Amino acid sequence: MKFKITLFILSVLLLATSCRPTKHVPQGEYLLNRVKIEVDNKDVKSSSLKPYLRQQPNHKTFGIIGLPLAFYNMSGTKDNRWNRFMRKIGTPPVIYDSILTEKSRVEIQKAMKNKGYAEAEVTADTVIKKRKIKVTYNVKSNTPYKLNRVTYNIPDDSISKYTTLKDSTQYLLKKGTLFDYYILDSERERIAKELNDRGYYAFNKEYITYTADTTVGDHLVDLEVNLLPYPIAKPDGTGVVFVKHRPYTIRDVYFYTDYNPMNVDQRYTVVDTAYYEG
């Protein structure tokens, strides 16, 4: 019975404080009540742009009730046990910051550019009501840039054969593909992994670069995939020389027929070695 009464009182308090979400919002400031991203292109999901938001409102259970904020609002200004407890289990109100809003707008626009929408426009609109503010980021994608022609400038034949795929439908870079930074980077990672699997352990995606020609017109891009040579320091320390990438190969294989991994002493024992040339 006591538990039910406590639960009832707590529910009443939560209901009462939920009606005053701006209780701890300083005068002249606004509670960030809602943030929304609207994109005019169905190919770009608004959820993919949320990671670029620099400020988001307080969490709301089921998107309706802000319980953490409600708990925080149950605290008063005095420094006592009750107020400290409610502030600990709750979260303070998110105060609207115009600087963070502008940073979010810029980051969203950069993200759109990376997705191939170089001419995208992003605006941040605000609506104020009763010391609460709603921010809406309106994204106008405009015409995206797409790949027109893709060529591979790989002068090393031992590597160029591993950059192509048997099934052309699996190519990430092909005519009509969005000039998307993430797709371009995925192709670099694919080539690097393929070469690593072939023994080029020192190879990484940084050796793959792109040259893009956007003068084709009609929002088309001619793309060239380039291979950078491998740098090696000169023995005299005066600089570096560039050489071809080389795969690692197995030189010698040794078989220890009576080796016992459980015997610690054997790990440091010199064994007789017989060499065989096949």
Regions found by a protein language model. Name each.
Residues 8-16:
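Bacterial N-terminal signal peptides
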